[in-house]
Amino acid sequence: DKNPNKYKEYLENYFKDLNLNKNNFFTDISNYLSYETGQPTHCYDSTKVNGNLVFNELDTNEEFETLLDKKINLTEKNSVFLLNNEVINLAGVVGGKNTSCSSKTMSVLVECAFFKPEAIMGKSLKYDIQSEASHKFERYVDPNCHDMVIRRFIKIVSDHTNIKNISVCSHVFEQNEIHEIPVNVDKINKILGTNINKDQYSNYLTKLGFDISKDQISIPTF
């Protein structure tokens, strides 16, 4: 049970700088990661996820209570997560109240996914939901960043508490192609009027997410 008032300095600065309210431990980390990486995540209290969790795109006609305590009527084709055939998450927009995290949540299921913009477009407007996740998914999120985001989530949690058990399930359907370009450090120095050696150049670009292989660099998809 984490006290949402006690975080590391970088998290505290995030809430202070953006003038945001704290919710609970896992939700706060999820919100921070969306800000830091641009990739929304969603946290389920795993003790409330009992049964078959399935993602589907289907015509729905049912009432859905969001984690914002708002009931909406799903009346058209939606991308949803179902638990035992009941909608628990309007994918890419908002999660459901029945599986949401609280200050008492000790075990969490983290969803880090890619949704095509056309599948999310207009949903928050139709259902009158102010959603940071839908705002990002509508504008495209890099499908290659999931591993990095999950590792970062784990790191932030471990900065604040001990982790007992971790398991990762991954399904890759779509990724952006990684492009490589040739780089000549001497030519870069000549053009820029700099004096950067190859070790410095490699160090700088690696920190920015580039992969270096001799005189080739791989451009990060983000």
Set out the residue ranges of the language-model regions.
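RNA/tRNA-interacting regions in translation and RNA-turnover enzymes
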Residues: D1-F222
